[in-house]
UniProtKB/Swiss-Prot annotation:
Name recorded for this polypeptide: Chloramphenicol acetyltransferase 2
Additional note from the record: Type II chloramphenicol acetyltransferases are sensitive to inhibition by thiol-reactive reagents. The inactivation occurs as a result of chemical modification of Cys-26.
Active-site residues, as the UniProt record annotates them: H189
Chain's role: This enzyme is an effector of chloramphenicol resistance in bacteria.
Principal EC category: transferase
PROSITE patterns, A to Z: CAT
Any one of the GO BP annotations: response to antibiotic
SUPFAM superfamilies recorded: CoA-dependent acyltransferases
Keywords: Acyltransferase, Antibiotic resistance, Plasmid, Transferase
Amino acid sequence: MNFTRIDLNTWNRREHFALYRQQIKCGFSLTTKLDITAFRTALAETDYKFYPVMIYLISRVVNQFPEFRMAMKDNALIYWDQTDPVFTVFHKETETFSALFCRYCPDISEFMAGYNAVMAEYQHNTALFPQGALPENHLNISSLPWVSFDGFNLNITGNDDYFAPVFTMAKFQQEDNRVLLPVSVQVHHAVCDGFHAARFINTLQMMCDNILK
């Protein structure tokens, strides 16, 4: 996969990157609730399922913003031209999950075809990584449909240069006449700030509101 190398001598976040990568090593998570009322109504008019469409939308937003596509490669900071989703699939019989991946395509019908092909081949394979090693250029998506939450955090240790974002969805919440979806965004502070996380959420909400428009 192609990528662009970032020149740390001229990058406007070089001081922030150095601080949060070398001195105050940290990431952060932001949890919010998406209003998916209109989204679910629009989705009901299609043959698409909720989870893969959310995988598509999250991937689409990630591929708009380079701060969510950053990685260390050959001791250099880069951002991928494109990142592909790694998503979890739960196995009821073993109470375990697998991590599958498919190629991101801007066209939703092409994306769904790729997703469905992966699911047809691997959804019943209970290995953690049925397809083998994950692609370098990946983002992470998972779902906890059994419980709702107001906050969610992963404690990632031992890999200070793991910059791939992690997105976690929860069980729907009903609030008056609205349906809300809790979503957690977890990022490395060396490459992503609160502004970027908020922009991601706001863009994702807009995409949910206009999924078929």
